[in-house]
């Protein structure tokens, strides 16, 4: 939990209080079987449920010497990327909302729903999917999955330009964001910032490229 003292856009003081959302997951896992521990991973971060469960599955599979079929590896990779899009769209939409750009906020949530619908149709869950299992996945993809993913990709490409026109390319948004919350490349590396945060600071550390897993080395 972060308690902030602000002066306009400048954070003057920041007090960190740890423990408010600590749930002792590592301790809980000591008394669970390997399959039982998987239920906890989806709840670590509802915007990264697929990736968290995937990571633990890979750890267990490596320890047990389980070979995962290539089709499963492709399914896991695609699901991870859909979840990543879900996460980025929520970030974009909430940033817009915090800055009062409600039109852009609604656009972001509109398109995030399309991703969640695709995930739900195959996994049965929108946020917590419990889809990956040790050595595989709970069930094969829905018959409409491939078609809907392709349709979403074709839909989303021009929409990104629309986002830029209404928000990221807007002079008001740019003036408010420039110089606010600056994170240097050195601090990004020191703090372990990755993804979009790291790239914005000049630190392009992408584990999918540096240490490919699943089928990231092939796509």
Task: List where the protein language model places each region.
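Active-site bordering "gate/hinge" segments
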Residues: 1, 5-219
